Structures are given as C-alpha cells and as structure tokens.
Curated annotation (Swiss-Prot):
Catalytic activity from the UniProt record: Release of the N-terminal residue from a tripeptide
Cofactor remark: Binds 2 Zn(2+) ions per subunit.
Source species taxonomy: Bacteria, Bacillati, Bacillota, Bacilli, Lactobacillales
NCBIfam families: peptidase-T, PRK05469.1, PRK13381.1
Binding site for Zn(2+) 2: D142, E177, H381
Record family assignment: Belongs to the peptidase M20B family.
Keywords attached to this entry: Aminopeptidase, Cytoplasm, Hydrolase, Metal-binding, Metalloprotease, Protease, Zinc
Protein name: Peptidase T
Enzyme Commission numbers on file: 3.4.11.4
Gene transcribed to yield this protein: pepT
Role played: Cleaves the N-terminal amino acid of tripeptides.
Amino acid sequence: MTYPNLLDRFLTYVKVNTRSDEHSTTTPSTQSQVDFATNVLIPEMKRVGLQNVYYLPNGFAIGTLPANDPSLTRKIGFISHMDTADFNAEGVNPQVIENYDGGVIELGNSGFKLDPADFKSLEKYPGQTLITTDGTSLLGADDKSGIAEIMTTIEYLTAHPEIKHCEIRVGFGPDEEIGVGANKFDAEDFDVDFAYTVDGGPLGELQYETFSAAGAELHFQGRNVHPGTAKGQMVNALQLAIDFHNQLPENDRPELTEGYQGFYHLMDVTGSVEEVRASYIIRDFEKDAFEARKASMQSIADKMNEELGSDRVTLNLTDQYYNMKEVIEKDMTPITIAKAVMEDLGITPIIEPIRGGTDGSKISFMGIPTPNIFAGGENMHGRFEYVSLQTMERAVDTIIGIVAYKG
C-alpha cells in the first residue's frame, strides 16, 4: 500500500541532527535528541491520533492508540530510536531517486557514489524510489525510517477506524547507537504483552537472536628506563599488550566471522612504554561460549601476571547485553504473528541472528519480549546509507497486520 505522508515525514526527520555522544553523562546524551522528541515527535504523535502522549526523563516519547475492538485484547508496543550513529549528521541533504534504473548513483557533488559493483544490495531495487545521502553525511534511516513507519501506521489507523486493532503503545527513545538508550527504559510504565523494535534492515527481516555482549578494558603497566641500559630492567607495556593480543584466537575477529560465530574485537589502544590501555568488545550467541570468552581473557591476564611476577595486567570485564533469544523462545507468539503477517503480505520472512544488539536485547530481559522487524535501511551508519520507499511502505503494512492479527 502507498502512504502519501510517509516520504515527507521521513525527509523531515532525517534533516534533524540527532547524533548521540558516547562521552556524554546525560540522558539523552545530546540536547538535539531532547529537542527532536519534544518539538517534532510529540506534537506529531498527538496530530496523528495517539493519546496520553508524554515525554519521560529517560528520554522516551510515549503514546497510546486504544484498541477499537474489544475482542483484540493484546497490548503491543512498537519502539524505534531517535539517535544516529557516530558519523556526520549535520546538514543531511537527502536525494530522492525515483524509478531507480539499476545503475550508479552519484551522491551529490561529493565524488562518492553508490555502485552496484560495490553494493550488491542495489540489485534488489530497480524501479523503486530510493532515498540516499549526498555523500557528506549519513542518512539516518537507522532508525528514523522506523519512527516514520510507526507514525504513519498510527496516522493510517486513525483515519481508517474500520481496521480493527488491539491497543498499541509507541515508544521513541534515545541513545541506541551508543548502547545505553534502553538502560533506563520503564517497562512497567510501557505495560504491553510484547513489543517490536522497528530497527531492522532489508525487507522481511525478523530477528529474535542477538549477540551477548561484554566490554573488556585492559591496563598494562610497564617500567620505562633508558633503552641503552634496559636489559633486565625495562618492562615495555606496548609489548605486554602485543603479547596479550597474540594469545587470543587469531581467527576470532569480526572481519573473519559470520553467522553464529563470535569474536574478540580490539577497538582502541593508547599508550607508551610506561603504560598502555586497550579496549575490546566480546561477542557470542551461546551463553556458554560467551562466558568462556570472558574466562579466557581473564586466564591470559592471570597467566601473564604470574609469569611477570607482579600484577602488570589489569582486566575489567563489563557485561553489556544478552541474547534476547533466551527470553523470546519461551513464548514465540510475537514471532509467530509477525511471520504469519509477512507471509500473508507476500513477504518472505528472513529469520537470522542479529550480529549486534538492539534496544530489544535489554527490554526483553526487563519482561517485555521485543524482537526486531525490518525498517528498510541499507549500508547504515555512513555516507552510503540508503532506503527504499517501497520497503518502508511494506513495513507499515506489516505493523498494521500485526496489530490487526486475530489468530
């Protein structure tokens, strides 16, 4: 189905810079997200027909569309995030490519281009309307496509009361891209049976497995002396960091793994001979494998300290989120419904693990099973990001089908 306001709504949203800031100590992490929620989203939530609309101190804009059929007793939530990833989000100037011809798309005058030879996903979209960047910023389809789709769903249902639906709760939240947005989510206040994050990629994505995730902060304490007299005295912290890294499995890196394979990822190293700090992330799907990865890092640190005769290697491990499959597989109702709706719409469900996390990873463990459905974005988090308008329309169709489902 086509929705006349969907494209303009999306273009309005992406032109607002809502980049999050991982170094901030506030919630939301940037004032621009507060302004976007209070000045743009909340007024529009009221205009499209949501009731009991309010903004919480945790950064979430919340609203409700009451059920219009007493036989549909479920309460279902839909959640998307306002922030965009760590890439330029100022001066977003989207290009609208109607009836895409399957060829190369020049991204404004930037010198960058979307070429099917480099981005095979483009082969799916001839004849469709694509929204791209101008090459100077990201687009923000992650996740403003989701926000636009949810808002358009509410607008359509309000205008078409003949479509019977259950109670719908909507939540637009902050700071998903920096991994903290759902930390303060108020599950009791949201009060639904289950929810969906509308934060996926291409048409048909339906996901209920995420990584389990941890962060590892390492400190290597060296002893710097003049290299000319260093023998037997110097302890080079840089070499300690290298030795530690070399004891990790050499093939367990993001660039060498896929599917259900986990990894260690060295994110950052700073330091000198005297001391080094290194940051890793640890990812795996199975709980035992996840715990084993953390234990392995601790074992390497302990062994090095024993061999060095002092505690020169300090490791701090912090769990970040867990595989939501552990919660959702106890009651697959949200997956069963979404799958049935997609199939009824002629959409092939793509049920694969997310090699990452979503707000749903944390919200599921707060008592609201929250799988993820497609929002349409491709090549997210950079200048090559784009989205198909037709995929966004199909996302709206899917949300409508979910809330009207009577099975």
